[in-house]
Amino acid sequence: YLDAPEVPAGGGGLVSSPKDYDRFLRMLLGYGRIDGKFVMSEEAVRVGVSDLIPATVDLTGSWLEGEGHGAGGRSKGSTFGWGGAAGTLAAVDFDLNLRSCLWTQYMPSEAYPIRDEFIAAMEADLADMRAMKKAA
């Protein structure tokens, strides 16, 4: 982390703690507001987590097939999230007002199936929770 990256990227080389990461997710769920203050505009959050890929782009066969892509993360329905280095995952669901994280420390992140298993379990739980909310 002492050397500048060849290509500047918003998430490239970021180092954080689970506490700070969760705070960031809380801010997203608050549409830019945390601890009673706006640290980001609501519009910036809404645009950043929305699907920014034009409908004319064919995603067939790509890693984004069936999903959208916001500013640095995947957008699927009311859920927005992304994966990081060393196997980490983070997501927020705006309809259910939930946030979730997976913290691991191994590289490459594909070395173990835990990310895929976590995503599958999370999506199943979210589907159940949406169904319960709809039925209520």
Residue ranges with predicted function:
Residues Y1-A136:
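Catalytic loop of the DD-peptidase/beta-lactamase superfamily, centered on the K-T-G motif
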